[in-house]
Amino acid sequence: MEYDWTTSGYDATVAQGVTPEEVHHVLVHSKARIRRYEDDHLRIIGRAYTGRLIEIWLREESSDHWLVVIAFEAGLAGQLVFRRLFRE
């Protein structure tokens, strides 16, 4: 997956205490739950190398290129869905 950051997305993610390295790991190296929630948006939940479960919202910029809108530590609902799907 090719992705870039929006300026506001990078700032919002860092403000949530999530590092760009954690986001990269989830998007490139982690098993993840991917859900399209609008025609041009994705919601991804995956485990970062730090062990934290990270939720990432992306907006499609062009075919197969995405912009990170925000990333944050997954809440209880995200954790339950991820555990059910991946039996963690």
Predicted regions and their residues:
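Ribonuclease/tRNase effector modules and their secretory precursors
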Residues: 1-88
